[in-house]
C-alpha cells in the first residue's frame, strides 16, 4: 500500500509539473505574438526534456516504445498534447502527427473512460492528414 501511495504521489507531482508547462504555453499562444516564438519553443523543449528525463522518451521513439516508457494513461494524454502542440506551433511534421493519432487510438482502445477530447482530437488529426494527402 505504501508503494502504491508513493507511486501515486510521484504521478500527481509529474502531472502538476507538466500541466504548468502547458499553462505557460497556452498563455503565450493566446497572445499570438510572433515575438514569443522563441519562448514557445523553449517551453516545448522544456516539456520534451521533462519526458526525456522522467521516462527516457526520445524524439526518435515510435508509438510502441513511447507506450512502453510512459505507461500511465494520464501522462500519455499529456504527451499526446505536447506532440500536437509542437505540430501546431512549429514542425508540421506529419510523422509526429501519425504518432499522435496512434497514441490517441491506443488510449481510446485501452482506457475504459470515454474521452470526448480524444475523440475530437482524433477527428481533427484525421482531417489534417487527409488534407495533407490531397
State the predicted function of each range.
Residues 31-37, 89-94, 114:
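Charged, low-complexity interaction regions
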Residues 11, 21, 43-48, 83-87, ...:
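Aromatic-enriched hydrophobic runs in primary sequence
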Amino acid at each position: 500500500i505504501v508503494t502504491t501511495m508513493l507511486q501515486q504521489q510521484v504521478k500527481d507531482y509529474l502531472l502538476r509539473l507538466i500541466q504548468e508547462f502547458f499553462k505557460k504555453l497556452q498563455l503565450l499562444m493566446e497572445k499570438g505574438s510572433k515575438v514569443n516564438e522563441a519562448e514557445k519553443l523553449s517551453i516545448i523543449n522544456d516539456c520534451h526534456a521533462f519526458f526525456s528525463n522522467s521516462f527516457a522518451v526520445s524524439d526518435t521513439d515510435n508509438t510502441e516504445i513511447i507506450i512502453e516508457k510512459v505507461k500511465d494513461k494520464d501522462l500519455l494524454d499529456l504527451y499526446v498534447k505536447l506532440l500536437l502542440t509542437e505540430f501546431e506551433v512549429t514542425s508540421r511534421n506529419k510523422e509526429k502527427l501519425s504518432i499522435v493519432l496512434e497514441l490517441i487510438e491506443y488510449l481510446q482502445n485501452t482506457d475504459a473512460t470515454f474521452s470526448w477530447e480524444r475523440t475530437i482530437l482524433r477527428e481533427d488529426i484525421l482531417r489534417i492528414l487527409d488534407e495533407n494527402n490531397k
